[in-house]
Amino acid sequence: VVLNVETLYNIWSALQGQPVTDTFVTVCGEVKQPATLRLAVGTSIVDALAAAGGVTCENPAIIHGGPVMGSLVESAEAPVTKTTKGLVALPMDHPHVRRMRRPVSVSLERAITACCQCRQCSDLCPRALLGHNIAPHKIMRAAGYALTKDPAVWTAAFLCSECGVCDTFACGADLSPRQVYRSVKAQLAAAGVKNPHKATPTPLEELVYRRVPTERLIWRMGLEPYVMGAPLVREVLLPAVVKVPLKQNAGAVSVPVVKVGERVSRGQLVAEPPPDALGARHHASVTGTVTAVGNEVSIEREA
């Protein structure tokens, strides 16, 4: 089991009876003062960017998470959750943003026209190197031409961790096996197909020789201008309004236990999982008054 520092900190806090009300988030990219901020859960992305000095380009794209495995946010008004660890602002015309916004239909068309089956994506795939039965070049062939009757080629989508090595580093034709796998995985899940791959893998000998150099990855993604320090700001940012989402984790959507107009204290329970369901409790990250209850619990902080 691998635990990051913040997870260990939250475990220690739980042992002291303290719930998770804050999260440490690195805000970087097109911002004036890149920083690692301690944000109250439910802080809007707009407030987080403002705390880093504001954005330095017009109408930026915001990546929630890291640049490789993160996702584009639909609205900068969206709240920070317990699992938010990074916010990366990039120009809307940045090559990596264009890659992330590319529809899967385009990826499929490109698979037909541009994939030369060089298998570079499969040679560098971390999951394949760990011994899993996955070969990204085969899904490109199958999706593009439907030339396989082997169900394992399709169910290998369950083995894809969507790490992004294939499309951000390996492929010289700017194709995205990851996006194709993501689409296949969603279709299999919608059809009720379960992951059939249960074998314990044996890592390949080539694993130690095929690791991706961080510097080269940054260069390939065009992120060199944004490589700089993001110093930790220890003080908690408590905005005027927070919106605590009722679903921030795997499992069921939590049920609110507070009502509009109710006064809550920082750390007070505001939502919990339904009975006999897997989920997580959520707590007020500021002291104030509940102003709305829906998919989120909105709290206006006391002055």
Labelled PLM ranges:
Residues 95-99, 271-285:
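Short, Lys/Arg- and Gly-enriched loop/turn segments at beta-strand edges
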Residues 288-290:
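Conserved hydrophobic positions within beta-strands
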Residues 265-279, 296-299:
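Short hydrophobic beta/alpha edge segments that flank linear recognition/processing sites
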Residues 1-43, 51-58, 66-67, 75, ...:
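Hydrophobic alpha-helical positions that pack around
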Residues 90-112, 122, 127-204, 239, ...:
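Ferredoxin-type iron-sulfur electron-transfer modules in oxidoreductases and energy-metabolism complexes
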Residues 1-5, 75-106:
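Active-site loop ensemble at the mouth of alpha/beta enzyme cores that anchors a bound cofactor
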Residues 203-252, 256-257:
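N-terminal, Lys/Arg-enriched amphipathic/low-complexity engagement segments
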Residues 254-263, 267:
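Short histidine-centered loop motifs in beta-beta connectors
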